[in-house]
Structures are given as structure tokens and as C-alpha cells.
Amino acid sequence: MTEHDHLTARLRGRGVDVDAAEAALRSLVIETPSWGYGDSGTRFGVFPQAGRPRTVFERVDDAAEVHRLTGTAGAVALHFPWDAVGDVQELADYITAAGLRVGAVNPNLFQDPDYVLGSVTNPDPAIRSKAESHLLECIEIARTLGSTAQSLWLADGTNYPGQDHLIERRERMIDSLTRVYAALPAEQEYLVEYKLFEPAFYATDLADWGSALLVCRRLGERARVLVDMGHHAQGVNVEQIVSILASEDRLGGFHFNNRKYADDDLIVGSVNPFELFLVFCELVGSGGPLPRLTIDQSHNIEAKVEAMVMSVVNIQDACARALIVDRAALRAASADGDVLAGHQVLLDAYNTDVRPLSASARRALGAADDPVAALRASGRAERVAAERGDAR
């Protein structure tokens, strides 16, 4: 018997519908970010890598390779103006030809020097108007690309008490976003992301899930909260936030990454895999369709394509563990008030080696049993480095 045979026999003995679990794994759609394939770094410096993509088209090529190896990374999220081209339709056609589709479109309201005091919260109405124009432009770009979501993260905030009026900033933001939301076509949703701090260090205008949720309620039904795993204070119970937003039908999606201290953008599941498992327990347990699953990471010292492949595999395995949780036993333990029995149900699933299950799902999709090993054995990194040139 194979490892997969042994695992499925054990799981079926526990009452797990293995076929349904594998079908759910095959149906995963994970968006990888175009910006995650290019040069990135910290405020201390950037370490260029040989073979780094020089254009958005090469970033799409890298995303297509991740999808080929993993089978479930069939969407690529884009960032504008980072991914701007002269002909948006040409980019759309290239993405389709690569076997991908466009995920969320991410506007950039944090790099232009005009936004030093904020974008849609800026005291200057001319700068707010400039920010709105970019947001409206991204809606049209998304329409051409076939994207169904705008993913908004605002860096807006203040560094010192007294710098600006906190409530007036909030009202400026809602006023601008209301106009932008009104221009949103029916096929697009608005994902509103929050972050506790950075680059603002005194007050961030969208600092937590509550402030983001309140803005979404002001905007409309197609405005939902996007949860970035690294945008919380230390020790925050992210899975509880997920469960509340999902129950309110306001969970729009995720930016998956991992953290040790702040917004570290490490490989998802690398530092705290149990947290990732618990998040998927809430998602799978809700019984509804999964929200948008996007990776948002900054690979500063690691090989970028390999890091992205590992990230997708970690998400697949976390989802697989959540799918084999004995829900009946969990509910029974809860009803009986048996604290540790319920905890043990989750530990049983978490400690199960689900890699054969994930590999079987990938195999059915024509992907690799072991994507990281397959990538390393392929020699692609060396070929691409030779084609694209040295980093220096």
C-alpha cells in the first residue's frame, strides 16, 4: 500500500469523506502576487537576485510556473502602477495564454510624494481628487483585465498627536471611497484592508478590522474586509476575527503571509502553522464558499519562485488538515462541555501528515507530487538566470 492508501484508510475509519476532501483541495484557487516575484527588500536595503523578472510579463511567467507545479495557483494579483503597460488588453491576453486569470487589482496610494500626508484622507482636496482618479482608473483597468475585485490598502495615517483631525480624516476617506464605490461595476467587489501601524506610527486611518468593517457598511454590500495575517498586534486572535467577519458576510479575503513580530511578510505557515490551520478550520467549518485567498509576501533573501511554491503548498496542507477535522466529535465535545476533548479533536487533525492527500489532489490536476523538489530538479532557476541576466 502507498502512503496515500494508508492515510485514506485511516481517515475513512474515522468517518472522513476523503473524496470530498480531495475535491475541495482540487477546487482551491490561490492568487499569487505579481509583486512577490520581483525585487523587494526592507528600508535597510534590497538584495537583487539573478533571474529576477524585468517586466510584468516575466512576473506572469513566474506565476504560471508556480501554478504548473502546484495546480491551484491559477490567478495572479496585479498592482498598479507597478504592473502598468501601454496596452492593458495585451497584458490580459498574455495572462490568459499563460493559463492564468487576473485576481484582484491593487491600486497604489502610498508611494507618490503627494501622499506624504495621506491620499483620500489628505487635507488638500486636490490630492484627494488625484487619489480618487487613480482608484477610478484601476476600476477601468480591472474591467479590461476581467478582474472581479479592487483590493484597497491605505497607508494613510498620522505620526503625531495634533497632526490632523482624526474624525475629519475618516470622513474625507469615506466621502472619497463612496464616490469610487459608486463607479464599481456589478462584477467587481471592493476589498478593504486594514493595518495596525506602519508607515503611520501614531494613528492609522484603517487600523483594525472594526474600522474597516464600519467603512464597508457605509459603502455597500459589495464592500468586504480583507484580512492580512501580518497586520495585527501581537497575540491577536486572527481566527476569531475571521469567524466574525464570515458570519456577517463581510469577509472578502486574505493576504496570506506569516509574522514573528510585525508585518514581516514571511512565507505563510513558516512561523505559526497552527494559526494558519485554525484560520482554515473557521473557513471550512462555515460551510460556505471560500473567500479570495491571496498571498502577499516580500521575499527578501529567499528564492522567490521557490518561496511562492512553498507558500501555496503550505496553504494546501493547512486546508487539508481543516478538511479532516471530525466535526461531529467537535460539536459533541462542545455540547458536553468537554474542554480538552474538543481541543484533542483539532490536534488529531493538525498532527496528521496530510501531504499524501495534498499530493494526490495535485496529481489529479496534473501538477507535481512534491512541487518544491520538482522545481529544484527542473533546473529552471538556473535557466532563467541565464536568460534574464545576473542581478548585479
Q: Can you annotate each of these PLM segments?
A:
Residues 35-37, 79-83, 107-112, 155-157, ...:
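Active-site beta-loop-alpha junctions enriched in small/polar residues
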Residues 27-37, 80-110:
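Glycine-rich, aromatic-flanked loop segments that form ligand/cofactor-binding clefts
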Residues 49-66, 132-140, 235-244:
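Short, acidic/polar
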Residues 27-47, 108-122, 154-160:
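N-terminal small/glycine-rich loop or linker at the start of catalytic domains
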Residues 1-36, 45-47, 64, 148, ...:
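Histidine-acidic metal/acid-base catalytic patches
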Residues 10-24, 101-102, 114-220, 345-348:
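Active-site acidic/histidine proton-transfer and metal-coordination neighborhood
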Residues 23-32, 36, 49-82:
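Catalytic domains of carbohydrate-active enzymes, especially glycoside hydrolases
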Residues 75-77, 104, 151, 255:
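Conserved beta-strand positions in the central sheet of alpha/beta enzyme cores
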